[in-house]
Swiss-Prot record:
The keyword Cytoplasm applies. HAMAP family: RNA_methyltr_E (MF_01547). Keywords: Cytoplasm, Methyltransferase, rRNA processing, S-adenosyl-L-methionine, Transferase. This is Ribosomal RNA large subunit methyltransferase E. S-adenosyl-L-methionine binds at G67, W69, D87, D103, D128. GO terms for molecular function: rRNA (uridine-2'-O-)-methyltransferase activity. The active site is at K168 (proton acceptor). GO terms for cellular component: cytoplasm.
């Protein structure tokens, strides 16, 4: 049986977060326009600025649940494209999106992904992954950078020539070192801070374009 959450059962910080969330214009907009999360508008702004995803492309979305980025990618690639959404968490089905549940680091999951690709070249890897935060920045920051490194390693394995990469990164310890890894792997690096990113958030999005022939 569902339990009703009352203000009395929430901490002061949780109540503040809930008020901010419910009042967030991007949350309201996502609900109105049918997106699964406000994060959709981050990718939409990046797409509007850089025109990364095009009809017929093959896209892999890491840490895809609940699926807002995959929603956008599926619409952009169209019927001739392919979007593979991967997450260790379950995700409700989406039209024009193939969902693969599991840890993409595991050989069995990676092999399933290759089977889905069936020889297709991956044009872009997108990642909005973030760890479950503890509130301790000394713990959360390295965890998030680690996820970024996993996403980059995956991209290096699957991207075709001139492939592209979009990844969410928290600014802080390890950011500069990770940024250099992306610089070493792509011809062009751009940094985006979409309007849908909350002002207090340390997140930015690194956009790598033109996968280098010899990845570092």
């Amino acid at each position: 049986m569902a339990t009703r959450i009352t203000n009395q059962k929430l901490s002061k910080s949780s109540r503040a977060w809930m008020r901010e969330h419910l009042d967030d214009p991007f949350v309201k907009k996502a609900q109105k326009e049918g997106y699964r999360a406000r994060a959709a508008y981050k990718l939409l702004e990046i797409q509007e600025k850089y025109k990364l995803i095009k009809p017929g492309m093959t896209v892999v979305d890491l840490g895809a649940a609940p699926g807002s980025w995959s929603q956008i990618a599926g619409k952009l690639v169209g019927s001739k494209g392919l979007v593979i959404a991967s997450d260790i968490l379950p995700m409700d089905a989406l039209p024009d999106v193939t969902f693969l549940q599991g840890d993409f680091r595991e050989e069995a999951v990676f092999e399933k992904l290759l089977n889905i690709l069936n020889g297709r070249q991956v044009d872009i890897v997108i990642s909005d992954m973030a760890p479950n935060t503890s509130g301790n920045r000394a713990v959360d920051q390295p965890r998030q950078i680690y996820l970024c490194e996993l996403a980059l390693d995956f991209a290096q394995k699957v991207l075709g020539p001139n492939g592209q990469f979009v990844v969410k990164v928290f600014q802080g310890a390890g950011f500069d070192e990770f940024r250099k890894q992306v610089v070493d792997s792509f011809d062009v690096l751009k940094t985006a801070k979409p309007a849908a990113s909350r002002a207090r958030s340390k997140e930015v999005f690194l956009v790598g374009q033109g996968r280098k022939k010899a990845l570092q």
